[in-house]
């Protein structure tokens, strides 16, 4: 089932992330990401119409990716809130997470260092877009 949501152009990225984590050739990276992050990360994205949607990335248990502000296996350890456009730019390598954070365009609730652990997963998604 697709994680794409109408009105959120970047939502297709969550399908790409899920497919990458489920790819048997990426099993080593998946295990490393889970070990490094050990967190459930929720992405709260706001589109141009002002609507907010959430997706989770469970890097605490099994590398699951899904729709919603909570994994079936636990609450979020980290919440990242940003616009749909900025998330797309971040994954495409056109925006810098640190710069978005410093300018208030990326809000982080929880352990900022654990949030940095998803960099490899986003980079892999960028390569598969």
Swiss-Prot record:
Domain SCP2: 10-129
Alphabetical keyword list: Acetylation, Lipid-binding, Peroxisome, Transport
Keyword Transport: yes
Gene3D superfamilies reported for this sequence: SCP2 sterol-binding domain
Modified residues (N-acetylserine): 2
SUPFAM superfamilies tied to this protein: SCP-like
Main location: other
A GO CC annotation given for this chain: peroxisome
Molecular function as annotated in GO: lipid binding
Compartment list: Peroxisome
InterPro entries in UniProt: SCP2_sterol-bd_dom, SCP2_sterol-bd_dom_sf
Coiled coil: none
Motif (Microbody targeting signal): 127-129
Pfam families in alphabetical order: SCP2
Domain of life: Eukaryota
Miscellaneous note of the record: Expressed essentially in cells grown on palmitic acid with small amounts found in cells grown on glucose.
Quaternary organization: Monomer.
Function statement: May play a role in the transport of fatty acids. Binds fatty acids and fatty acyl-CoAs including palmitic acid, oleic acid, cis-parinaric acid and palmitoyl-CoA (in vitro).
Protein name: Fatty acid-binding protein
Source species: Yarrowia lipolytica (strain CLIB 122 / E 150)
Upper lineage: Eukaryota, Fungi, Dikarya, Ascomycota, Saccharomycotina
């Amino acid at each position: 089932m697709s994680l794409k949501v109408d009105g959120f152009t970047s939502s297709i990225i969550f399908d790409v992330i899920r497919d990458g984590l489920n790819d048997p050739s990426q099993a080593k990276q998946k295990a490393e990401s889970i070990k490094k992050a050990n967190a459930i990360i929720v992405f709260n994205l706001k589109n141009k119409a002002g609507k907010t949607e959430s997706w989770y990335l469970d890097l605490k248990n099994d590398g699951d990716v899904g729709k919603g502000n909570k994994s079936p296996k636990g609450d979020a350890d980290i919440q990242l809130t940003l616009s749909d456009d900025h998330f797309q730019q971040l994954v495409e390598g056109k925006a810098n997470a640190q710069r978005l954070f410093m300018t208030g365009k990326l809000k982080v609730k929880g352990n900022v260092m654990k949030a940095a652990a998803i960099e490899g997963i986003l980079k892999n998604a960028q390569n598969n877009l």
